[in-house]
């Protein structure tokens, strides 16, 4: 219908749809139609006021034109003028947030640029000013788009991971463990709305993925294609709204479980979680995790104070979890190495809450 020259009006948006669904580019119903026009519906929200001018839009608002301009900027020239830099940044950044790696006309040139320029390093002693340089900002967005999409066997340890979330000790052993997780998760009542009522529940494993390393995880068939995920990294926030960064904006990664055998990883490393959607009733499930690092973990009513003091707090991963009845603390392991009274601490928090 569209390709034969007819018109179509699409009503609706994908930002709310994207809260409980994945892969906007392929799975959002409107994007099964829109690409034939050269357009996509993104999951971003925007202003309801749109001014349609008498002249065509800036050419740099076209994705491939912006990619070509950026590629030329780093190779043959010309340099992108300052008057176009912000437009190029916004155009490409919107696409990196949505387009998957199979959009090769978009991603292949960008991957070549990252290979040539290297990774942007951000650390406590090497801060990054957002909005100071649109070209640097768009390269940061491109790098993020890649490390959140590359298959596990193509990931490398990000140079910034040593600073945050921290390095795994060089002598830390890699282990294989069978871990039991609770697959029953109600979620918050829908009335919580924007407070993440329909967010997944994170179930800890006590294991850590080293930066850039492949972790193999085997799960029961009952979890496959049920919107159950593997999350690597406890920090699921985004810092893109800040003015100054002392770590990268996004350092966690989710893998949707679509097979009984998953190969996962994170360029920054992080604690390993199995996350369940609201209204899950899977019961206790056993997952096998291979090539991970043991992390300090206290579970109220399960871990004894002797086990904590003699074994758990000494485990090598750089982040630890303390689980009370109502509250979980996720903290750098350096903060708990000398914590002797973990039972008293978590009982205090449970009483307070």
Map each language-model feature to its residues.
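Glycan-recognition and processing domains
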Residues: 104-193
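Low-complexity, Pro/Ser/Thr- and charge-rich linker/hinge segments at domain boundaries
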Residues: 288-322
């Amino acid at each position: 219908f569209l390709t034969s020259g007819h018109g179509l009006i699409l009503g609706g948006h994908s930002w709310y749809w994207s809260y409980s669904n994945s892969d906007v580019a392929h799975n959002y119903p409107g994007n099964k139609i829109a690409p034939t026009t050269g357009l996509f519906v993104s999951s971003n929200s925007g202003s309801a006021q749109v001014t349609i001018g008498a002249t065509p839009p800036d050419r740099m608002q076209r994705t491939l034109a912006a990619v070509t301009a950026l590629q030329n900027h780093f190779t043959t020239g010309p340099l992108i003028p300052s008057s176009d830099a912000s437009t190029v940044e916004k155009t490409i950044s919107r696409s990196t947030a949505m387009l998957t790696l199979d959009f090769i006309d978009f991603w292949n040139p960008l991957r070549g640029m990252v290979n040539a320029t290297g990774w942007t390093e951000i650390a406590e002693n090497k801060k990054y000013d957002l909005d100071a340089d649109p070209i640097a900002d768009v390269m940061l967005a491109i790098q993020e788009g890649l490390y959140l999409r590359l298959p596990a066997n193509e990931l490398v340890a990000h140079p910034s991971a040593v600073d945050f979330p921290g390095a795994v000790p060089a002598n830390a052993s890699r282990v294989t463990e069978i871990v039991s997780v609770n697959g029953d998760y109600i979620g918050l009542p829908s009335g919580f709305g924007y407070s993440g009522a329909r967010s997944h529940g994170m179930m800890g494993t006590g294991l850590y993925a080293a930066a850039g390393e492949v972790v193999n995880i085997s799960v029961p068939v009952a979890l496959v294609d049920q919107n159950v995920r593997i999350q690597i990294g406890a920090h699921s926030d985004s810092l893109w709204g800040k003015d100054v960064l002392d770590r990268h904006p996004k350092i966690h990664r989710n893998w949707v479980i679509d097979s009984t055998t998953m190969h996962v990883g994170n360029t920054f490393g992080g604690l390993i979680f199995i996350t369940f959607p609201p209204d899950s009733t899977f019961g206790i499930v056993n997952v096998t995790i291979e090539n991970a690092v043991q992390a300090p973990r206290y579970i109220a009513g399960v871990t004894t104070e002797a086990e904590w003091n003699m074994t758990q707090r000494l485990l090598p991963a750089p982040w630890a979890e303390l689980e009370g009845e109502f509250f979980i603390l996720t903290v750098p392991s350096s903060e708990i190495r000398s914590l002797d009274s973990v039972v008293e601490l978590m009982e205090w928090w449970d009483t307070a809450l």
